[in-house]
């Protein structure tokens, strides 16, 4: 076996299927697992080969699918993409023929054909397919897998030299066994994945000649293998030990199975890199997430999108982070965060909701039952419990009391609250934006801050407490409160109020 270093001239990704068994208004290849659509995974694997050209063949919901593919290609840095349209002639042979037509007419070298609904195919396997194909001078190289149950798959039939003689479809193997009593073809467990490396010149010669004179009325790509052998070309194979690499998603159950397998692969990778995953069965990490060594993921953790978690951080239990950055040694528990930045040594949760634009500085804290949005919180600042901070800036080492909120919305526009450094706010303070509180200022419990507070000042609302002694026994006689008050020596005065 050769080293996987060859670069193909082109990769053709077949993405024209409708996917009716998904029973969805979303095209099959746009369904997602592990943070990417099915076709996104296929394009990423294809582009890992660094081909000169990459073609996606589309048909069903053409405009929507093509736009999605172009968006994914831009995200992956693919700069050699072409979109080809499949016409009314059905079959994989026709799809590849139209994909080939989108490539330069004088293209030489290796053309890889793969599928847009096979998300677990690895770059390493594709590279090995190309390398062996070119090193051995094959006309066609088939990617195969060996299954416990090969029902429904085309069987790999080999000649005396061990090369691929032909691919026998399952129904043909059954028919042969029924008519001859020979079930040797049915017993074959090595199957065709539908993924190939071809010589480009061979495809140009043979694809136009493929007939639709068959039961399905389709142009079968597998016919190229027989044509190659008729020309004296070598048809060989490369096998994968992981059968999940060649599994497609045709319905929701298969989509779920593939998602679970992909997640297991992702978690195994990160555990090898020094990440502790306490319970892999309840932990989900997208392929786009970045983790550092000595990160700990506790049960119920979900990490999505461009989330990154730095060394020594602990996430979970029961936390969902999307496009969120977590700093070194930070602790995030029972938190839902989207597009947030959590500084080193910071603490979040439990039961915390960080909305887009939340930036928590180093050593900061956002505690239980807090919601934040578009807020920058300085180093060492604390928002410990029961509050809302939105459209705000909070300075370093400020302590925000229990039940504080920034009243940022006047019914039409959002307004900003600025709270300085080393501020101390009393419980249930309301900041009616726009308002600024200077460094070192205090607010009293229950204060409604409607005007700017200078540095070092105390802001409180001057409402004196009024106490009506004996009110409960007089006004709520017969209640348990009245009985308790009388037992404590209170007398009902009949005071008004």
Curated annotation (Swiss-Prot):
The active site is at 385 (proton acceptor). Residues 480-490 have a biased composition (Low complexity). InterPro entries: Bifunctional_GlmU, GlmU-like, GlmU_C_LbH, Hexapep, MobA-like_NTP_Trfase, Nucleotide-diphossugar_trans, Trimer_LpxA-like_sf. Its main location: cytoplasm. Its cofactor is Mg(2+). Binds 1 Mg(2+) ion per subunit. It catalyses: alpha-D-glucosamine 1-phosphate + acetyl-CoA = N-acetyl-alpha-D-glucosamine 1-phosphate + CoA + H(+); N-acetyl-alpha-D-glucosamine 1-phosphate + UTP + H(+) = UDP-N-acetyl-alpha-D-glucosamine + diphosphate. Residues 253-273 are annotated as: Linker. UDP-N-acetyl-alpha-D-glucosamine binds at residues 14-17, 28, 86, 91-92, 115-117, 154, 169, 192, 250, 355, 373, 388, 399. GO terms for cellular component: cytoplasm; membrane. The keyword Metal-binding applies. It is found in: Cytoplasm. Its EC number is 2.7.7.23, 2.3.1.157. Gene3D superfamilies: Hexapeptide repeat proteins (2.160.10.10), Spore Coat Polysaccharide Biosynthesis Protein SpsA, Chain A (3.90.550.10). Acetyl-CoA binds at residues 408-409, 427, 445. Homotrimer. Catalyzes the last two sequential reactions in the de novo biosynthetic pathway for UDP-N-acetylglucosamine (UDP-GlcNAc). The C-terminal domain catalyzes the transfer of acetyl group from acetyl coenzyme A to glucosamine-1-phosphate (GlcN-1-P) to produce N-acetylglucosamine-1-phosphate (GlcNAc-1-P), which is converted into UDP-GlcNAc by the transfer of uridine 5-monophosphate (from uridine 5-triphosphate), a reaction catalyzed by the N-terminal domain. HAMAP family: GlmU. This is Bifunctional protein GlmU. It comes from Micrococcus luteus (strain ATCC 4698 / DSM 20030 / JCM 1464 / CCM 169 / CCUG 5858 / IAM 1056 / NBRC 3333 / NCIMB 9278 / NCTC 2665 / VKM Ac-2230) (Micrococcus lysodeikticus). The gene is glmU.
């Amino acid at each position: 076996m050769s080293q996987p270093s060859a670069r193909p001239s082109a990769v053709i990704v077949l993405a024209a299927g409708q996917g009716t068994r998904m029973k969805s208004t979303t095209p099959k290849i746009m369904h997602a697992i592990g943070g990417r659509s099915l076709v996104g995974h296929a394009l990423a694997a294809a582009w890992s080969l660094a081909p000169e050209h990459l073609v996606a063949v589309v048909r069903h919901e053409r405009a929507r699918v093509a736009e999605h593919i172009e968006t994914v290609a831009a995200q992956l840095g693919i700069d050699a993409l072409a979109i080809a349209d499949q016409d009314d002639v059905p079959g994989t042979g026709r799809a590849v023929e139209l994909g080939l037509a989108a490539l330069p007419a004088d293209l030489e070298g290796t053309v890889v054909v793969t599928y847009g609904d096979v998300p677990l195919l690895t770059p390493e396997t594709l590279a090995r397919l190309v390398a062996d194909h070119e090193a051995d001078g094959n006309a066609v190289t088939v990617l195969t897998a060996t299954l416990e149950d090969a029902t429904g798959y085309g069987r790999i039939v080999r000649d005396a030299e061990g090369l691929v003689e032909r691919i026998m479809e399952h129904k043909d193997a059954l028919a042969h066994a029924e008519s001859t009593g020979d079930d040797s073809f049915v017993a074959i467990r090595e199957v065709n994945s539908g993924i190939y490396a071809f010589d480009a010149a061979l495809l140009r010669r043979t694809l136009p000649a493929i007939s639709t004179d068959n039961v399905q009325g389709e142009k079968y790509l597998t016919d190229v293998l027989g044509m190659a052998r008729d020309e004296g070309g070598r048809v060989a194979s490369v096998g994968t030990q992981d059968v999940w690499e060649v599994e497609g998603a045709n319905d929701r159950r298969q989509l779920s199975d593939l998602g679970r397998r992909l997640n297991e692969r992702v978690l195994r990778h990160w555990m090898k890199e020094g990440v502790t995953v306490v319970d892999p069965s309840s932990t989900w990490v997208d392929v786009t997430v970045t983790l550092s060594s000595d990160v700990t993921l506790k049960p119920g953790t979900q990490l999505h999108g461009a989330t990154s978690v730095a060394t020594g951080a602990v996430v979970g239990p029961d936390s969902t982070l999307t496009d969120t950055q977590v700093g070194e040694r930070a602790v995030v528990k029972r938190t839902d965060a989207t597009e947030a930045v959590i500084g080193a040594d910071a603490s979040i949760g439990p039961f915390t909701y960080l909305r887009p634009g939340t930036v928590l500085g180093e050593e900061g804290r956002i505690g239980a039952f807090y919601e934040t949005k578009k807020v920058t919180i300085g180093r060492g600042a604390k928002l410990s419990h029961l509050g809302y901070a939105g459209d705000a800036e909070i300075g370093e080492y400020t302590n925000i009391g229990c039940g504080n909120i920034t009243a940022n919305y006047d019914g039409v526009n959002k307004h900003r609250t600025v709270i300085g450094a080393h501020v101390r706010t009393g419980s249930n303070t309301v900041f009616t934006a726009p308002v600024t509180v200077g460094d070192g200022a205090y607010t009293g419990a229950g204060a409604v801050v409607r005007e700017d507070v200078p540095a070092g000042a105390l802001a409180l609302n001057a409402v004196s407490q009024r106490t009506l002694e004996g009110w409960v026994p007089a006004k709520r006689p017969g209640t348990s409160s009245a009985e308790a008050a009388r037992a404590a020596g209170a007398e009902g005065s009949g005071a008004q109020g």
